[in-house]
Design a protein with these regions (language model features):
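Phosphate/diphosphate-binding loops
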Residues: 137-162
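Amphipathic, small/basic residue-rich leader segments at the start of a protein or domain
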Residues: 1-127, 147, 151, 155
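His/Asp/Glu-enriched, well-ordered alpha-helical/loop segment
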Residues: 134
């Protein structure tokens, strides 16, 4: 069975040596306390999650696929996908770069991009589920009315809605 090995050193090279991310983040008031150790710790945990949770579901998920129950109009996802999403939510990953005003962690978006790079590499089919939700979050956060933000963003941030 193929194994996913997250490219942590490559990501650390880009973040630290190429972009100087920790120094750049210090110039941004909301991220001034984020240092290289914090960036590395989040990358390591994201890599561990990607390798241990969605990656093992990649081949079995492709083989099984989704199925529509025509009687109930419900879609059944491959075995393990629902549990993997529950672990994603439990780990706080939906909230990683989301606004703390809506329950997010407020970490830099660059970390969210690294997370999604690893998730897509580990299991692109599974990653569509949280990825679409994060896109909806970003759209509403940028363009939603105050009422839409109040209604939708906390549920998307927590992972309750996907």
């Amino acid at each position: 069975m193929p194994q996913y090995n997250p490219p942590l050193r490559d990501m650390q090279f880009v973040l630290h040596e190429l972009l100087g991310a920790a120094d750049e983040l210090k110039l941004m008031p909301r991220h001034a306390e984020i240092d290289a150790d914090t960036l590395n710790a989040v990358l390591e945990e994201a890599g561990k999650f990607a390798a241990e949770v969605p990656a093992p579901l990649n081949s079995p998920g492709d083989a099984e696929g989704c199925a529509l129950d025509k009687a109930t109009h419900e879609v059944r996802t491959p075995k393990g996908f629902k549990e993997a999403y529950a672990r994603y939510v439990e780990g706080g990953w939906p909230a990683l770069s989301c606004d703390p005003a809506y329950g997010g962690q407020g970490l830099p978006l660059v970390l969210n991009q690294c997370l999604y790079e690893m998730l897509n590499s580990a299991n692109q089919a599974w990653t569509v589920y949280p990825g679409l939700s994060h896109g909806a979050y970003e759209c509403l956060h940028a363009h939603g009315s105050p009422e839409e933000k109040r209604l939708y963003l906390p549920k998307l941030t927590s992972g309750e809605w996907t």
